[in-house]
From Swiss-Prot:
Region: Disordered, residue numbers: 104-140
UniProt KW rRNA-binding keyword: no
Domain LisH: 4-36
Official protein name in the record: SIR4-interacting protein SIF2
GO CC, one annotated term: nucleus
This protein's UniProt keywords: Chromatin regulator, Nucleus, Phosphoprotein, Repeat, WD repeat
Organism: Saccharomyces cerevisiae (strain ATCC 204508 / S288c)
WD repeat intervals: 155-186, 218-248, 259-289, 316-345, 357-387, 399-428, 440-470, 503-534
Length: 535
């Protein structure tokens, strides 16, 4: 039983046509004899034959695992049968059974031999040994290279719309629901009768009054925002009618901050925990004194003939952005009209600076405390890096074709972003270019979060799937391939570390959040209950 290369070319050509890849099919048609085969076999080969053959090969590889060396059927492992067996795992098993011939000795290619002879001096020998050591360290750092880990759900949550983990306690999760209630929960692994399982214990319920929204008149009052202070001792909750409440980590109410009249979209604490800034969907931004609960500044930016002013009773205009950020204990930035970013001091009513460059609403603002640079992302599909005292961006990254939903710093020289165009991109400030790329065609990304240690990046797709990318492994491969060279010819693929799929169709994801240890992710779904998955 065999298949020729020309027959395989024909099946690939048929597959390209069936999937609508017309350009690829045309290229294959020009370079092979597929049209001759099509005349002979078109009526006898059904649709999807190539996929069917690959699936049968995967099944054959798995069935081989169930038969021992003597030909007897092995005992069935229920846990093994419940797991997904995919193409990557089948190829890995085949590679272990039939390893490739090493290119050494008489199997070494002539070109390799010549290059080895040309590089026999001491310096080049040391360089080759260093490169080999780097490659070996990469391979040994991931024993399951090629495998995609399937994440397991450990705890079911209620029908949540947002969630955030305590920044210092890896077991405490705050999550908000549609019924104006947020909850503080502790999630720990326990041991009972020799079996380990995860247990969720409710610490407190953080309740808002069930009131109508002042702007929309909606009868719902769901929790739209949650924000822990940097020391993890306090949390702010925001709801649809604009009310903010301040709580301690045991659930005791500390203060009620009531000035907004529209759903809250962003809340940020300053480093010392004395002030917060909040923003609602009507572009109203308020600076609060946390200790007294009083309003220190009130900004309501709108466009009037190309300029921005503070206006009263402003509503109905388009969103200027959905994020705010502190750049110091007494300085912060907020979105302004026409894609501008305004810089304010807590003691000044007028802006002290204006950053111009974006041409759409601001979706992300994130300040790096180490290099003192501000990262911004916009619905115009661009990311920009700003340096204090300069109104023009020092870096501008183009590549996304739709709105950017998440952007984060990866160390001091790189930023990672994801967009509704389905792509995840890693950028370098020093080289001012794209370093790595991952694209899932046709599936928009709704959320993205980086782990606290910066080693993994989780993205949530519209179809309910969560992908976790391995940034640590990507960084190692990048150093091995390019070293300290400035030129990057082609972006690297971003290694996929793990994946998790919703069990319900058409169940997109509202929100993601990492715990501080980087070993758990909370997921908020549109239809079913929320989940906590273990990494």
């Amino acid at each position: 039983m065999s298949i020729t290369s020309e027959e395989l070319n024909y099946l690939i050509w048929r597959y390209c046509q069936e999937m609508g890849h017309e350009v690829s099919a045309l290229a294959l048609q020009d370079e092979t004899r597929v049209l001759e085969f099509d005349e002979k076999y078109k009526e006898h080969i059904p649709l999807g034959t190539l996929v069917n053959l690959v699936q049968r090969g995967i099944l054959y590889t798995e069935s081989e695992l169930m038969v021992d060396s003597k030909g007897d059927i092995s005992a069935l492992n229920e846990h093994h049968l419940s797991e997904d067996f995919n193409l990557v795992q089948a190829l890995q098993i085949d590679k272990e059974k039939f390893p490739e011939i090493s290119s050494e000795g008489r199997f070494t290619l002539e070109t390799n031999s010549e290059s080895n002879k040309a590089g026999e001096d001491g310096a080049s020998t040391v360089e080759r040994e260093t490169q080999e050591d780097d490659t070996n360290s990469i391979d040994s750092s991931d024993d399951l290279d090629g495998f995609v880990k399937i994440l397991k759900e450990i705890v079911k949550l209620d029908n949540i719309v947002s969630s955030t983990w305590n920044p210092l306690d890896e077991s405490i999760l705050a999550y908000g629901e549609k019924n104006s209630v947020a909850r503080l929960a502790r999630i720990v692994e326990t041991d009972q009768e020799g079996k380990k399982y995860w247990k969720l214990t409710i610490i407190a319920e953080l309740r808002h009054p069930f009131a109508l929204s002042a702007s929309s008149g909606k009868t719902t009052n769901q929790v739209t925002c949650l924000a822990w202070s940097h020391d993890g001792n306090s949390i702010v909750t925001g709801v649809e009618n604009g009310e903010l409440r301040l709580w301690n980590k045991t659930g005791a109410l500390l203060n009620v901050l009531n000035f907004h009249r529209a759903p809250i979209v962003s809340v940020k604490w300053n480093k010392d925990g004395t002030h917060i800034i909040s923003m609602d969907v009507e572009n109203v931004t308020i600076l609060w004194n946390v200790i007294s609960g009083t309003v220190m500044q009130h900004f309501e930016l709108k466009e009037t003939g190309g300029s921005s002013i503070n206006a009263e009773n402003h509503s109905g205009d388009g969103s200027l952005g959905v994020d705010v950020e502190w750049v110091d204990d007494d300085k912060f930035v907020i979105p302004g009209p026409k894609g501008a970013i305004f810089v304010y001091q807590i003691t000044e009513k007028t802006p002290t600076g204006k950053l111009i460059g974006h041409h759409g609403p601001i979706s992300v603002l994130e300040f790096n405390d180490t290099n003192k640079l501000l990262l911004s992302a916009s619905d115009d599909g661009t990311l920009r890096i700003w340096h204090g005292g300069n109104g023009n961006s020092q870096n501008c990254f183009y590549g996304h074709s739709q709105s950017i939903v998440s952007a984060s710093w990866v160390g001091d020289d790189k930023v990672i972003s994801c967009s509704m165009d389905g792509s995840v991109r890693l950028w370098s400030l020093k080289q001012n270019t794209l370093l790595a790329l991952s694209i899932v065609d046709g599936v928009p990304i709704f959320a993205g979060r980086i782990s606290q240690d910066g080693q993994k990046y989780a993205v949530a797709f519209m179809d309910g799937q969560v992908n976790v990318y391995d940034l640590k492994k990507l960084n190692s491969k990048s150093r091995s391939l390019y070293g300290n060279r400035d030129g990057i010819l082609n972006p690297l693929p971003i290694p996929l570390y793990a994946s998790y799929q919703s069990s319900q169709d058409n169940d997109y994801i509202f929100d993601l959040s990492w715990n501080c240890a980087g070993n758990k992710i909370s997921v908020a779904y549109s239809l079913q209950e929320g989940s906590v998955v273990a990494i």
